[in-house]
Each structure stands twice: as C-alpha cells, then as structure tokens.
Amino acid sequence: MAAPIAIPYQSFYSAAKAAINSLTLALRNEVRPFGIQVCAVQPGDIRTGFTAARKKSHAGSDIYKSLDHAVAVMERDEQNGMAPEAVAKIILKAANAKKCRALYTVGAQYKLFTLINKLLPATTVNWLVGRIYR
C-alpha cells in the first residue's frame, strides 16, 4: 500500500511503489494495441520472513524515538499481515482474466485505505498516516 499512501521512514520504498503504478498505467496504454494487458498488484502487508530478517542498527538516542515507533508499527502490521497464498490467488485471478484491471488492491482494509485516500485531501491523509507512525 506504499504506492497510494506514502509511509514515513519508507520514502524511497513508497516512491518506488508509486513509480511502479505509473509505469503500469503508461505501459498498459502503450501495449493495448497489441492485445497485451498490464496490471499491478498492491498487496499491503504480507506475513513473510521479511520482518525477522530486518536488521536494525542505530544508537538508542531520543532522535530515533519516532523511527523506533514507526518500525514497531510496521513490524506489527507485517506479522499480522495476510498469508502469501491470499495474494497469490489474486495474482492468479488477474493473470487468467480476459480483461484485467489496471490496479488490484488486496484485502478489505487496504481497499478501505485506498478509498479514504481518494476521498480525503492529500494533506489530511498524510497527517493521518503521520499520526499512525509517529
């Protein structure tokens, strides 16, 4: 979900995900005349070994307090994320669709986040996200 909603302390990751969505939308138009479909899947947090493999290395000073909290929120979300099999089902469905959607958001909570992101002003969404990760 880092593409539509930029996550604090993951600025490069969020930017890369947003770029993938832009690439998907542009490429989709470019290859449409050839009967080729392109889509991107936005799965949100998935339970994998990613959290356990995360390396943390910084001094324990107050300057890192908000970073520590943000990482704790990310780790909790990752550990409680959806099973990889659930995401695989959506990817398989998209791959087998006669006409796929441009963007697939996986999971009810992430669909809700995407809707909120579309309905509220960007400043409000950014403020809310900042409150979650602060």
Report the location of each language-model feature.
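Active-site-adjacent segment of SDR/Rossmann-fold oxidoreductases
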Residues: 5, 26-37
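C-terminal beta-strand-loop-alpha-helix "lid" module of Rossmann-like NAD(P)-dependent dehydrogenases
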Residues: 32-78
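C-terminal tail/cap regions
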Residues: 58-134
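Active-site loop immediately N-terminal to the catalytic Tyr-X3-Lys motif
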Residues: 5-11
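Active-site helix of classical SDR
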Residues: 16
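Active-site segment of SDR-like NAD(P)-dependent oxidoreductases
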Residues: 1-5, 45
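Conserved cofactor-binding/catalytic machinery of classical short-chain dehydrogenase/reductase
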Residues: 11, 19-22
